[in-house]
Amino acid sequence: MVRKKIALIGSGMIGGTLAHIIGLKELGDVVLFDISEGMPQGKALDIAESSPIDGFDVHLKGANAYEAIEGADVVIVTAGVARKPGMSRDDLLGINLKVMEQVGAGIKKYAPSAFVICITNPLDAMVWALQKFSGLPVHKVVGMAGILDSARFRYFLSEEFKVSVKDVTAFVLGGHGDSMVPLVRYSTVGGISLPDLVKMGWTTQERIDQIIQRTRDGGAEVISLLKTGSAYYAPAASAVSMAEAYLKGTKRVVPVAAYLSGEYGVNDTYVGVPVVLGSGGVERVIEIDLDKEERDAFDYSVNAVKKLCEACIALVPSLK
């Protein structure tokens, strides 16, 4: 059987971690691409040399030319500048938009049939621009955000309730930024909703509100502690879970930055919503009922994303 090919555009901390996790899971052969000569080759070799110890059979190689991604089944994009302490994701828009233009052209030429996962910030605007630049079908281009934000929310809740993260479910909608919308009503511990757990005395609404804010600040918290970089383990794990759902056709119900064409009353915008993710890419966008408070927060988040997309158009008018 021919193994799947997974191309990683960007070989920084997330790219290297992606390659390692993909190797351990034996999801496919890996091409690490980066414009920095030697970096992708060195990381590919280092990970490959760990394979006899960890017992995985995956071919890894590094490259500095887009030709190397030719025919890739999955492309995961991390290329661009990462946040530093004190920066918001939105501060990266100008420089990373130029990167997306180059990456989109490379994907369009060499991997037009791939399923593309974008991680580059500001996420929702960058995946929107990447889809435009690449010309790939909207259901084959997604952004990694909701899974990561939901994972952070789930972890913080598991710590609050002192239970296994496996028994905590959570949904975070909207843009991947300060306006993200953690949905308390749809978040559960062992099937019991958070509002019911508050009524049962397991926690207080004040604590839930604090956890929601910590979730919104999750990336910034990691950055402030690291001081010299941004999160990479959790973002990489999130993206690999998306790639795995596509490659194995598992039809996972997960929150991703997906293209909306009327769903939730939103058009021509990528924003975090629950979807069915399978071998067809985004096979279905799930529209859940939102109460007025949730709807207002979601609309506010969508408008924040739209403003970023408008800023992209101001820089590159052809995106319109």
UniProtKB/Swiss-Prot annotation:
Record keywords, A-Z: NAD, Oxidoreductase, Tricarboxylic acid cycle
The UniProt record lists the keyword Oxidoreductase: yes
EC number of the protein: 1.1.1.37
SUPFAM superfamilies reported for this sequence: LDH C-terminal domain-like, NAD(P)-binding Rossmann-fold domains
GO biological process: lactate metabolic process; tricarboxylic acid cycle
An annotated Gene Ontology molecular function: L-malate dehydrogenase (NAD+) activity
Family: Belongs to the LDH/MDH superfamily. MDH type 3 family.
Name the record gives this protein: Malate dehydrogenase
